[in-house]
A protein has these predicted regions:
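Short, Gly/Pro- and small/polar-rich lid/capping loops
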Residues: 1-20
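GHKL/Histidine-kinase-like ATPase module
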Residues: 13-18, 24-31, 41-43
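N-terminal glycine-rich anion-binding loops that anchor highly charged ligand groups
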Residues: 23-36, 67-72
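N-terminal cap/recognition module
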Residues: 32-64
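Glycine/serine-rich phosphate-binding loop and adjoining beta1-alpha1 elements at the start
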Residues: 64-178
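Hydrophobic Val/Ile/Leu positions in short beta-strands of Rossmann-like dinucleotide-binding domains
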Residues: 182-184
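Glycine-rich Rossmann-fold phosphate-binding loop(s) that bind the pyrophosphate
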Residues: 187-188
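N-terminal Rossmann-fold NAD(P) dinucleotide-binding loop
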Residues: 191
Length: 191
């Protein structure tokens, strides 16, 4: 079995925090993979199955995603190890935020991920004391509502761009747009 520490290379991670709060029982992980282009950006997973190795790998993925998109962010990822439907999610989120506060938002900017919601991000930002500490907040706190379909719109733009490139390269015969069907697998914002 691969150890999280075997994932270290010249690109990162720069910081790895494993935190535990004896008052709540909260166990969490924060991996700040690379901040060469800006603070590490990545969601907070809240699930019983979270492992340090998973968070290492997801943080690296965020490094490459932000770099590929030309964003002024590096990569990072957070994880809280518990079923959010069983534990007191508010106290656990507050505890996680409190323990990683020194890194937010200068080195880490959180977001929603598996098991976290807009309300979790509101709790996180309030506990950090800085609304810039995360994205994915409710609209009342300056967030963009999911109902606007920003993620789905991004998928649509990416698909249209890919089709235009294929057409320009004359790689394949493309049917008329009205004859085209697309299948997207997944759940949540994208699916």
């Amino acid at each position: 079995m691969t150890s999280a520490w075997e994932e270290i290379d010249e690109w990162g991670p720069e910081k790895v925090l494993q935190v535990y709060d004896p008052d709540t029982g909260m166990k969490g992980v924060l991996v700040i993979d690379n901040t060469s282009t800006g603070p590490g950006k990545g969601g907070i997973r809240f699930a019983q199955s979270v492992t340090p190795l998973e968070i290492f790998r997801l943080a690296r993925t965020m490094t490459w995603k932000c770099a590929a998109a030309g964003l002024p962010f590096g990569g990072a990822k957070g994880g809280i190890i518990a079923d959010p439907n069983i534990v007191d999610r508010v106290s656990w989120m507050k505890s996680f935020a409190k323990m990683i506060r020194p890194y937010c938002p200068s080195q880490y900017i959180a977001a929603t991920d598996v098991g976290t919601t807009e309300l979790d991000m509101a709790i996180f930002a309030h506990e950090i004391g800085d609304m810039r500490a995360c994205t994915g907040k409710p609209s009342e706190l300056g967030g963009i509502p999911h109902e606007l379909g920003t993620t789905g719109y991004g998928v649509s733009v990416a698909l249209q761009t890919a089709l235009n490139i294929l057409k320009e390269l004359k790689i394949t015969h493309l049917p008329q747009r009205t004859q085209t069907r697309v299948v997207i697998q997944g759940f949540g914002n994208v699916g």
